[in-house]
Amino acid sequence: VERATLNGFINTDFPSFMNRGFYTIMAAQFLSSLADNALLIAAIALLTDLQAPDWMTPLLKLFFVVSYVCLAAWVGIFADSMPKGRVMFISNSLKALGCLLMLFGSHPLLAYAIVGVGAAAYSPAKYGILTELLPAEKLVVANGWIEGLTVASIILGVTLGGVLIRPDVAGGLLEIFHLEAVGLERFAQAAIFAIVFIYTFAAIVNLAIPDTGARYPKQDFRPIESLKHFWQSNLLLWRDPLGQISLS
């Protein structure tokens, strides 16, 4: 039985590289990314159904990505403030909330931005937990599995989104779940309703991720100081040859 010490923290024993915790992380990541990409297709379809101006469609992705940029200096602090499985649970719950807001009256762009906040908070947790769960020599392989699974989920998610907005599939969802009773009558809304369940399932899987036992010193929330530290770290990475490769 092997033990790993990373960043001063001793992880629990694990018998092999593919332990239960890593399988759970992969499953949660796949489901969350699958829903992210299916939602993009469904949200575009919703804008089309609502006869929104053409300029709104490209803004969907912008509203999603802007959270990564605006919150980059602080999401890492949030991810280290509690067990990362819980962080991922909160993040997926926030994504599900964004979907529900999109269904029940909120502007699609604003609702999609909330989904983006959840995605931005999710990223540092999904990568950070690997350093707590696995030994350093296994991290490259682990990240390869995560990235490969993410690529697969992107392809399948876009496909799933296209399937869910089909009239026969979406119409079936509207009928089976009696969505008209709660004011949901559009095919795109039925698709988003189904995606809420995927996010919910991903959040439930997050709860099954084992607590690695890693605890970090509590950091006071100082937005300006955190922004300065983030900027300095960013410059440091750009000056490092390997860091340049990673960022580019």
Q: What are these model-derived regions, one by one?
A:
Residues A4-F22, I209-L247:
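Juxtamembrane intracellular "pre-TM" segments in multi-pass secondary transporters
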Residues I41, L100-F104, P167, T200-D211:
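Membrane-embedded alpha-helical segments of multi-pass transporters/permeases
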Residues G128, E132, E185-A188, I192-R222:
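Helix-loop junctions on the cytosolic side of multi-pass membrane transporters
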Residues S93-H107:
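C-terminal ends and interior cores of transmembrane alpha-helices
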Residues A42-L50, M102-F104, L156-I195:
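Transmembrane alpha-helix termini and helix-breaking/packing motifs in multi-pass membrane transporters
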Residues P53-K61:
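Juxtamembrane helix-start elements in MFS-like secondary transporters
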Residues G21-L40, L60-A79, P83-K95, A111-R166, ...:
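Substrate-agnostic recognition of the 12-TM MFS/MFS-like secondary transporter fold
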Residues A52-P53, P83-K84, P135, V169, ...:
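A helix-boundary/kink motif common to multi-pass secondary transporters
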